[in-house]
Swiss-Prot record:
This is 2,3,4,5-tetrahydropyridine-2,6-dicarboxylate N-succinyltransferase. PANTHER family: 2,3,4,5-TETRAHYDROPYRIDINE-2,6-DICARBOXYLATE N-SUCCINYLTRANSFERASE (PTHR19136:SF52), MOLYBDENUM COFACTOR GUANYLYLTRANSFERASE (PTHR19136). Keywords: Acyltransferase, Amino-acid biosynthesis, Cytoplasm, Diaminopimelate biosynthesis, Lysine biosynthesis, Repeat, Transferase. It catalyses: (S)-2,3,4,5-tetrahydrodipicolinate + succinyl-CoA + H2O = (S)-2-succinylamino-6-oxoheptanedioate + CoA. GO terms for molecular function: 2,3,4,5-tetrahydropyridine-2,6-dicarboxylate N-succinyltransferase activity; nucleotidyltransferase activity. Its EC number is 2.3.1.117. It holds the Pfam family THDPS_N_2.
Amino acid sequence: MTQQLQSLIDQAWEDRANLSPKSAPADVREAVANVIGQLDRGALRVAEKQDGEWIVNQWIKKAVLLSFRLEDNAPMAAGGFTQFYDKVPSKFANYTAEDFAAGGFRVVPPAVARRGSFIAKNAVLMPSYVNIGAYVDEGTMVDTWATVGSCAQIGKNVHLSGGVGIGGVLEPLQANPVIIEDNCFIGARSEVVEGVIVEENSVISMGVYLGQSTKIYDRETGEVSYGRIPAGSVVVAGNLPSKDGSHSLYCAVIVKKVDAKTRAKVGLNELLRGD
């Protein structure tokens, strides 16, 4: 079944310029709706870790993108106090008390999650935004005004602090989603975008900006890397001087690395303040 779905989605993607809400064939509509439904239930994921490496299921991402071509905007009620006008309904639009109880997560008003996102048990959505295709795993806190972008993958027991921005793949179009692995802490107002991977047990301080072009400087080794924060890293915002010393440019600095036991025992402030 999955292979048939993938083949149909791939074919539709090649013909996407000719698709519209009025012209799309029924089998394409059904295939895309099937994928979005499975994403919503957590049965499919845009990215999965296999043998220690993250594999992006590009065909699922294509289905998410195709879904926008297949729907017209429509009015959407919001708690009786306003309306919205969009293509993607709320994940919780038709939820009953029993559905919320079965889901096992908390949703604090006015948090928004779009249909096609997955929220696992014991997750908490403070007034925040989770976009289509995103995966928020067990025990994760999405704090106030944090944004989880389309198709982003958030691990278990992650804390996305207030105002954190996790980039998506839709606007601008990105090849791979942002991935935040298990037990990470992302400090307030930090941004992780453009498919950057933050590996497990890492701590990102407040106001750190990570994209594919951001230099990541390891203070211990002096090495500069891009696009990935190694497991157990403690990262703060910093600057690196230019070769001629005339100016400096922003970078992210790995000030230390800690193992999971240290991460569990030591307070966040102590990790960030320590030399």
